[in-house]
Design a protein with these regions (language model features):
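Bacterial Sec-dependent N-terminal signal peptides
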Residues: 1-28
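N-terminal ligand-binding lobe of clamshell/alpha-beta domains
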Residues: 20-358
C-alpha cells in the first residue's frame, strides 16, 4: 500500500473561495438598471440603479441610488433563493425606501429583504466570511459569531473576550453553534444583518426568521468554480460599505476593496493554474472525514473539486458531476480511496491527530 500522508487543514479557508428565474436570466426579473459584470459567479446577479438616470457607467462605480442582489437557488434550477434590495443609509436612502414601497409589486415569488448599507452590526455564522471581512477592512461590522472554536482569527478571540465590557470598544458576542444559535444573544447585539450558509431542504431558519432581521444567504460555496465563489466578495463589499473611509490604515470603501482584491486573486489563481497545468499529473487525493455514519466529500464540480482539478491533482471523485457534497458510506470511500496518496481534511483540535486516533 502506498504511503498515506495526512494533511490537517486549519480553520481559515482560502479566499478562493437569478430572480425567480435562475442563473443569468435573473437580470430579466429585476427592475431595469445596470447589471454588474460577473465573470465567474453563476448564482449571483447584481443590478445597480442610478439616481433617476440609468447610465452604463453606474455598474462600474459605487454611486447608485439602490441595488438589487439576486441569489439563484442552487438546488432548484430556474428559481431564486433570495432577493436583496440594498439602499444606502441617510435621507436620500429614506426617500428611496418610500419610493420603492409605492411601486413595488406585492406578488413577489420569493423572499425579498431590504438592507440599509453600510451594515454596521452583523452576526456572521461562517468562519471564512469573518476572514474576508478582515481582508476588506470591514471587520468592525462583526458583532456576533457562531462556531467560535472554528475561527482562527486572534482579533476575533480578543474581541469575544471583551464581550460584556461596555468600555471595551467594539466587542463580539459568542452566539453559540450555527446549527442552534443563541437567539437571546443575537437579539441583544441588535444586528442589521445575519450572514449564514443556506442548505438544501433546510425548511427555513426557525426562530431567526422571526427576528425580522435580513438573513444573508451566502450560497457562494455552491458555485461551480473557486473564482465564482471568490467573486461573491463584490456583493459582501456592497453590504458592508459604499462610503469612503479608513480601516487598518487602508483608504477606500469595502466595495472598492472587494473589486481590487478579487482582481488580484483572479490574476494569481489563473497564473498558478497555468503553471500547474504544465506539470505532470499530481498525487491522488481523498478529502474530509466520516461524520457519524456518513462521509461527505466534495462533488467533482464543486468549488473544492474544481480547485483540485486546477491544481492538477488526481481527485478520486473528479468524474462526478455534482456541485455540492456527496454523502458516501465509509465502505464506499474505502473501496475507492484505500490507495490514495494524500488524505486532506479540516481539523480544529488543539493537538495533531495520529493515525491510530483516525
Amino acid at each position: 500500500m502506498k504511503k498515506l500522508y495526512i494533511l490537517l487543514c486549519g480553520a481559515t479557508v482560502a479566499l478562493l473561495m437569478a430572480a425567480c428565474q435562475g442563473g443569468k436570466t435573473a437580470a430579466a426579473d429585476a427592475e431595469a438598471g445596470d447589471t454588474l459584470e460577473m465573470k465567474y459567479a453563476k448564482l449571483l446577479t447584481i443590478v445597480k440603479h442610478g439616481d433617476g438616470e440609468e447610465t452604463s457607467d453606474a455598474a462600474e462605480g459605487i454611486d447608485y441610488q439602490y441595488a438589487e442582489a439576486l441569489v439563484a437557488n442552487p438546488w432548484k434550477a430556474g428559481t431564486m433563493l433570495h432577493r436583496y434590495i440594498l439602499i444606502p443609509k441617510g435621507e436620500e436612502g429614506d426617500k428611496t425606501v418610500a419610493m420603492l414601497a409605492k411601486r413595488r409589486s406585492t406578488g413577489a415569488r420569493c423572499t425579498t429583504d431590504t438592507v440599509r448599507t453600510p451594515v454596521e452590526r452583523s452576526a456572521v455564522f461562517i468562519a471564512p466570511h469573518c476572514q474576508l471581512m478582515y481582508e476588506l477592512g470591514c471587520q468592525q461590522a462583526i458583532r456576533g459569531v457562531c462556531d467560535l472554536d472554528y475561527i482562527n482569527i486572534p482579533d476575533v478571540k480578543k474581541r469575544v473576550a471583551l464581550s460584556g465590557n461596555t468600555s471595551a470598544g467594539i466587542s463580539i458576542v459568542d452566539c453559540g453553534s450555527s446549527m442552534a444559535p443563541d437567539i437571546e444573544r443575537i437579539i441583544a447585539l441588535k444586528p442589521e444583518a445575519i450572514l449564514l450558509s443556506p442548505f438544501e431542504n433546510s425548511g427555513g431558519y426557525g426562530k431567526l426568521d422571526k427576528l425580522h432581521v435580513p438573513i444573508i444567504e451566502a450560497a457562494d460555496y455552491m458555485e461551480s468554480s473557486p473564482l465564482g465563489r471568490a467573486e461573491w466578495m463584490k456583493f459582501y463589499g456592497m453590504l458592508f460599505g459604499n462610503e469612503e473611509g479608513k480601516s487598518n490604515g487602508i483608504s477606500g470603501s469595502c466595495e472598492s476593496k472587494a473589486d481590487s482584491l478579487f482582481a488580484k486573486i483572479e490574476k494569481e489563481y489563473l497564473k498558478l493554474k497555468a503553471e500547474a497545468g504544465k506539470l505532470p499529473k499530481g498525487l491522488s487525493i481523498l478529502t474530509e472525514r466520516k461524520t457519524g455514519n456518513v462521509w461527505y466529500v466534495p462533488g467533482g464540480q464543486s468549488t473544492i473539486g474544481i480547485l483540485l482539478k486546477d491544481a492538477n491533482a488526481r481527485y478520486i471523485f473528479e468524474d462526478d458531476q455534482h456541485s455540492g457534497s456527496l454523502a458516501m458510506s465509509p465502505e464506499q470511500i474505502l473501496a475507492k480511496g484505500k490507495q490514495v496518496d494524500v488524505w486532506a481534511f479540516k481539523y480544529f483540535g488543539g493537538a495533531p491527530l495520529s493515525q491510530a486516533q483516525l
